Amino acid sequence: LDAARGPLLSWYRENRRDLPWRENRDAYRIWISEIMLQQTRVEAVKPYFARFMEHFPTVQALADCEEEELFKCWEGLGYYSRARNLKKAAEIIVSEYGGALPADHAALLSLPGIGSYTAGAIGSIAFGLPVPAVDGNVMRVLSRVAGSYEDILKQAVKKKMELAVEETLKTLKEGEAGDFNQALIETGAIVCVPNGAPLCGAPCPFYTVCEARKKDLTAEIPVKTPKKKRKIEEKTVLLVECGDKIAIRKRDDTGLLASLYEFPNLEGKLSGKEVLEQMKCRAVIEKELPTAKHIFSHVEWHMSGYLIRVTEEIPGLLFADREELKEKYPIPNAFAAYRKLAAAQTMDSCES
């Protein structure tokens, strides 16, 4: 790393992407962007980041918002625990740090939802702290540069890489830590790419020192332990329509997709007859809906569905019109296909 630090910084300053959260070194903007970028592509994050900053321009605004308002703004990004932790952390920042993120690595690490990578990114980019920010992009780059067959999903391997980066950060001029960390991340994002063959001649700032390139090992490195096979769960989703409204319900306060809204659904892939038997009310199946699939980290939902018309609202369900579905109630991306169908569905008057 020491040998490549000069070329790496020069490469970054010439090739870095123009991203909205890089307009300045504001700690709040950096924090929000880093949380959004977990599990989500840069291009997908851009419009969400702009919308979030419009709704919650300050830590205080985030701390003061209603959770449901936050979830609605987050709708479509998924992994809603990220949003929940953002609000918890904002409340702590307001009460303990006067509404400004602390310029201290240990204090950043103590906040909900902030791990070693995010604390390193905020600390180095916003405050110039010489602390590493090692994510999947960086581990991929460092593994290939070293020609290492160590499993990058092991914590001991990540710790070793963090220590290596930290040693190099100590040799940099004051204020360069943020650019160095971003340069490593950027190399992994646009040259040593996560999917497909690396673009070694992009040019890559590590071209002359990369062991994996020199030994033609880029297809084998990095090494990752295969993930466990996800459990498959089948569900039957119901778009229950009464007049100009569609039924939704709030999920439990704990567990997967906690406190979000969903369309009523039943376990298993059910026939229309089985659905009506379980509903136990006067209902008519209008049509079968397309199938959909949603992948979580540990489970896959395989969904089928029905459009169902009822003559009166069903107790225990909340009936919302299309505008409310769009503007008010946060419905997670797991139901995106059915959310789109519900929004487009032409509603008729309730039958008498």
Indicate residue ranges for each PLM-predicted region.
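Intrinsically disordered, low-complexity, charged terminal extensions of DNA damage-control enzymes
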Residues: 1-17, 23, 186-352
